[in-house]
Amino acid sequence: MKILVINSGSSSLKFQVIDSETERVMARGLCERIGIDGSFTYKTDGGISIKEPVPMNNHKDAVEKLLTALVDPEQGVLGSYDEIDVVGHRLVHGGEKFTGSVVITDEVIQAMTECNDLAPLHNPANLVGVDACKALMPETLMVGVFDTAFNQTMEPKAFLYGLPYRFYEKYKIRRYGFHGISHKYVSARAAEFMGQDIRRVKTIVCHLGNGSSICAIKYGKVIDNSMGFTPLEGLVMGTRCGDVDPGALEFLAAKENLDIHQIMTILNQESGVLGISKNLSSDFRELKDAGIKYNEKASLAREIFAYKVAKYIGSYAAAMNGVDNIVFTAGVGENDSDIREEICEYLGFLGITIDEVKNREQAEAVRISEGTSKVNVLVIRTNEELEIARQAAAVAAQIKEGRE
């Protein structure tokens, strides 16, 4: 079964073609600057690599371009569009309506549209990608894989805020958690790597990148996630503030004469390690280099980030009454060995000891804790596209079984 995985943003569209039987990535690419000047990147497992300017007025143009590339006689990996069995779409926010992957029907699109207020930057862009694919491949099965679905096993004690309950009843204001596709893949891969049954282990996954979240997974089910009603809550991130006292926002608004939209822009785009470093950078590599040159604010930004991560790990270990695996993933989690080491220095109370040599290894999966460590600490390369393909293939298989 060949799966086309689509991750549609407001002005970009990432894609992969995956053979679900072998899990081989046949082709991958990126359509950027849609509606502006347009850029198309395309690579195949056969060694073809293309990057070229391509005018794309809208997402339909982008999908048409990627499909044309996939079936090109010289550069393509497919004989025709008909070889695509399923299109798996990454959908950011499904609210409480969706607890798993679903066939994208008109009813699903309507339900997602009703969730647009919960993710105004992401959901409309996701749906534009769906519409473009439906227009060009009307007979192909479309499956939606929600970034919030994996977190829907959280209990009310974890997802409710200390607000009047009527606001939850009326507006569904609660904690949803994000990065669920990544957390699901990485927690399962960690258990597989360690030869464990995921239904018998307690895992904390640290998805650390420009956007960061931590997820507590007990026996295969999420019990908590550091992100909340929006991806703004939780850790200090690249440009996002993470947890902050709401009272400070009222104070700031009064002092700086700011409205709510200006405040939200600051919290989302001007805060995090970028803000702490006095606008030096949101890139952890650049902050590390600056810290080596005695830039105190750059070092402080990284220090605060590591401290907050360690605090969440400690609280989730308590919430699960123990932890078997702690897993680092995503751009910072996979590649910044110094940050991992700094985080783990706070976790000695859990009996964690880190192997300095292993911690600097680059691999798809590696255990970086010493053999005597009471908790397994791992680095696992996330693969959201593969997880989407797996879930899309599973939905397609269920439909096929129902017909037989």
Mark where each language-model region is.
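Glycine-rich phosphate-binding loops at beta-strand->alpha-helix junctions
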Residues: 324-347
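Phosphate/ATP-binding catalytic cores across multiple sugar-kinase/actin-like superfamilies
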Residues: 186-193, 300-321
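Glycine-rich phosphate-binding loop of actin/hexokinase-like ATP-binding domains
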Residues: 150-255
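Short glycine-rich phosphate-binding loop at a beta-alpha junction
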Residues: 79-92, 141-143, 322-331
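A mobile "lid/hinge" subdomain adjacent to the ATP/sugar-phosphate binding pocket shared
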Residues: 256-301
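Glycine-rich phosphate-binding/hydrolytic loop that grips phosphoryl groups
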Residues: 338, 355, 359-400
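Short beta-strand-loop/turn "lid" adjacent to the catalytic site in phosphate-handling enzymes
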Residues: 70, 74-122, 149-160
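Short glycine-rich, Thr/Ser-proximal phosphate-binding strand/loop in the N-terminal lobe
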Residues: 12-56
